[in-house]
Amino acid sequence: MSHHPKKVRIGLIQTTCGASPQDNLAKAVEWIRRAAAQGAQIICLQELFTSQYFCQIEDHRYFALAEAIPGPSTEVLGAVAAELEVVIVASLFERRSAGLYHNTAAVLDADGRYLGKYRKMHIPDDPLFYEKFYFTPGDLGFRAWQTKYAKIGVCICWDQWYPEAARLTALHGAQILFYPTAIGWHPAEKAQYGERQHAAWETIQRGHAIANGCYVAVPNRVGHEAPDGGPGLQFWGQSFIADPSGQILQKASPEQEQILVQELDLDALDVQRTHWPFFRDRRIDAYAGLEQRFLEDRNV
């Protein structure tokens, strides 16, 4: 029986972001067109691409940036998706209701249809990453969507530190796991901790690719942002794509705007999972403890 190899070309967009949401959306559309012109069929934008990273401070003014999903931005992007016949993953600030907001990724299929959304499950509260002030933790669980070109899953930035998130998304059948991201260096920490911070970030996501036998694709923003003065953040770019063995297929610049376009062989997932059968050997009867916050000594 003949078999036609299943391949797909994905695109990651790494750019700077300015103060105007309208300009940022227009820029995203322009770069989506560039990625599509290079052959990308599934295109992922970076986290919260319609604004600068406002979570560096806690300020109620920034709630005005939020919008409904589906809503104005997904309408624009859906039309572009249909025109170019590309799948788009778009990370947006979602206004769900009065006083209820999420950090959310919308998935638009190649015919422009809105397939659904993922709400960021893990919300950080670190210096210059004060997301708990703005975002309610997600309540939709981990998901995957069958698009025209591949079955994809989406997690967002801080989710990337949690193996459970990648695992559950892969168990929903995701062949490619996208992580739209906004991560960078605190200026006071870069000299001492910068190299190890970046290495840890890259390493753990390569590990997700290995453990789950899937592709991992991570678009990060780039450039220095200090929307309210102060030291700001230096976003380290270096968006990357890893294969199911954890090898980096492409990596972007730490300083420049860039598009990564990479062909992925989806048939390689079956080969990888057959030779490294981690799904086969999982002890699903032994993991109940993962539902606990911490496992106390039973003798106490």
Where are these regions (language model features)?
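N-terminal active-site segment of His-dependent metallophosphoesterases
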Residues: M1-I42, F178
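Active-site-proximal beta-strand elements of phosphoester/diester hydrolases
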Residues: K7-A19, T104, K117-K120, A144, ...
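Short, glycine-anchored, charge-dense loop/turn motifs used at functional sites
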Residues: I10, V107-L115, F240-Q250
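Cys-nucleophile CN-hydrolase/nitrilase-fold catalytic domain and related Cys-dependent amidase chemistry
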Residues: P21, E30-K117, I183-G207, A211-N212
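CN hydrolase (nitrilase-like) catalytic-core segments centered on the catalytic cysteine
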Residues: A66-V89, K151, C157-I259
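Short beta-strand scaffold segments in enzyme catalytic cores
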Residues: A90-L92, T104-V107, R143, S239-I241, ...
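A short, polar/charged loop-to-alpha-helix boundary motif
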Residues: K120-Y134, Q256-R273
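Cysteine/selenocysteine-centered motifs that mediate thiol-based redox chemistry or coordinate metal-sulfur cofactors
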Residues: F142-Q175, T181, L269-V300
